[in-house]
């Protein structure tokens, strides 16, 4: 670039910084620009790997959607528990008025420190979310769910009134306001969403999410969570097999998926994932029904192997660290492993 042009550019940059504040414009190569996106673990080792950065990205919007009872709230509560382990503050905006504090506690959430709001209208919910984000002192904000964000006009109107597009307009306006603040304060904002069926779709997928298209565009990560089967002990159902697909990912390659078990009353089975991923990476040997680690048998059948790892957290942490190292998530292992050791 010739001298005159570089002087003109320097003057323009100086003017922008003077008018809009330091850091409002910078070169991508500057050392001040954070190249690494900070991530919050999801509590699922397989999903952290599928996301490519070791968890959900901070300073971004994330959408988690799926059918009823697929594990959407369980996954978000697990993220909250991981954030609290790192000393972060979490807020849960419960538009569905359905959060069970006892269940949240079982998943490792410190309920006494969790900020909770049960708003009356969609406008109120999104305004509260925006105020929490702008405060800069909340690390993760969860909105449960987009489908329950009812516009004020609909609540105050008659039962049969038509309110086409109101919710979509509300979401579009709120996300325009939220996005810049989320990035500036490095807050992770998670929207839980439900699935609806499009009428008259002959070809392609008839499923769609509620609240219009704005969230699809503004979300950096979109996760599709599904229940694929039941976990049984005899005739009793003790949990559900779950698959999560990374439908959109702006921070790493998308379309990866993770499978894990959600045990009722416990949440995501960390030990179950360690066994599955350990076998896939040949860190754990499987011969018939027996599982072995370093030549030593750890259990016959997955349930017994899971119980062994639960009783020996140091072995579980060792395999966990090896899996993360193999998947280039060594940094994420450093933030979670010590906490889990101290919890035992």
Curated annotation (Swiss-Prot):
Keywords on record: ATP-binding, Cytoplasm, DNA damage, DNA recombination, DNA repair, DNA-binding, Nucleotide-binding, SOS response
Localization, UniProt: Cytoplasm
Matches recorded under Gene3D superfamilies: P-loop containing nucleotide triphosphate hydrolases (3.40.50.300)
One GO cellular component term noted in the UniProt record for this chain: cytosol
Alphabetical list of InterPro entries matching this protein: AAA+_ATPase, DNA_recomb/repair_RecA, DNA_recomb/repair_RecA_CS, P-loop_NTPase, RecA-like_C, RecA-like_N, RecA_ATP-bd, RecA_C_sf
GO annotation (BP), single: DNA recombination
Protein's UniProt keywords contain Ribonucleoprotein: no
Residue positions binding ATP: 66-73
Keyword Iron-sulfur assigned: no
Molecular-function GO terms, alphabetical: ATP binding; ATP hydrolysis activity; ATP-dependent DNA damage sensor activity; damaged DNA binding; single-stranded DNA binding
Record-linked Pfam families: RecA (PF00154), RecA_C (PF21096)
Reported function: Can catalyze the hydrolysis of ATP in the presence of single-stranded DNA, the ATP-dependent uptake of single-stranded DNA by duplex DNA, and the ATP-dependent hybridization of homologous single-stranded DNAs. It interacts with LexA causing its activation and leading to its autocatalytic cleavage.
Protein family (similarity comment): Belongs to the RecA family.
Family annotation (PANTHER family): MITOCHONDRIAL DNA REPAIR PROTEIN RECA HOMOLOG-RELATED (PTHR45900:SF1), RECA (PTHR45900)
NCBIfam families assigned to the protein according to its UniProt record, in alphabetical order: tigrfam_recA
HAMAP family hit by this protein: RecA (MF_00268)
Name assigned to this protein: Protein RecA
Species the sequence originates in: Methylobacillus flagellatus (strain ATCC 51484 / DSM 6875 / VKM B-1610 / KT)
Gene that encodes the chain: recA
């Amino acid at each position: 670039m010739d001298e005159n042009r570089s002087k003109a550019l320097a003057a323009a940059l100086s003017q922008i910084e003077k008018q809009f504040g330091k850091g409002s414009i910078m070169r991508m190569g500057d050392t001040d620009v954070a190249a690494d996106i900070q991530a919050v673990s999801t509590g699922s080792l397989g999903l952290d790997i599928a996301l490519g950065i070791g968890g959900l990205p901070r300073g971004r919007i994330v959408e988690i959607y799926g059918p009823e009872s697929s594990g959407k709230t369980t996954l978000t509560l697990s993220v909250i528990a991981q954030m609290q382990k790192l000393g972060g503050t979490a807020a849960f905006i419960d538009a569905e008025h359905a959060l069970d504090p006892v269940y949240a506690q079982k998943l490792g959430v410190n309920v006494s420190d969790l900020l909770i709001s049960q708003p009356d209208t969609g406008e109120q919910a999104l305004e509260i979310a925006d105020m929490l984000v702008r405060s800069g002192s909340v690390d993760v904000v969860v909105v449960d769910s987009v489908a329950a964000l009812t516009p004020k006009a609909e609540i105050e109107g008659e039962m049969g009134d038509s309110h086409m597009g109101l919710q979509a307009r509300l979401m579009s306006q709120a996300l325009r306001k939220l996005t810049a603040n989320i990035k500036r304060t490095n807050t992770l904002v998670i929207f839980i969403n439900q699935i609806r069926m499009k009428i008259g779709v002959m070809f392609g997928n008839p499923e769609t999410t509620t609240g219009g298209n704005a969230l699809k565009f503004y979300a950096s990560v979109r996760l599709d969570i599904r229940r694929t089967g039941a976990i049984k002990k005899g005739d009793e159902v003790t949990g559900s097999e779950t698959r999560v697909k990374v439908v959109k990912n702006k921070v790493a390659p998308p379309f990866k998926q993770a499978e894990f078990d959600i045990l009722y009353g416990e949440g995501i089975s960390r030990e179950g994932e360690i066994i599955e991923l350990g076998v896939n990476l040949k860190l754990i040997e499987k011969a018939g029904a027996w599982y072995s680690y370093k030549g030593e048998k750890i259990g016959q059948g997955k349930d017994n192997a899971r119980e062994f790892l639960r009783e020996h957290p140091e072995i579980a942490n060792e395999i966990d660290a090896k899996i993360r190292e193999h998947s280039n998530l060594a940094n994420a292992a450093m933030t979670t492993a010590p906490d889990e050791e101290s919890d035992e």
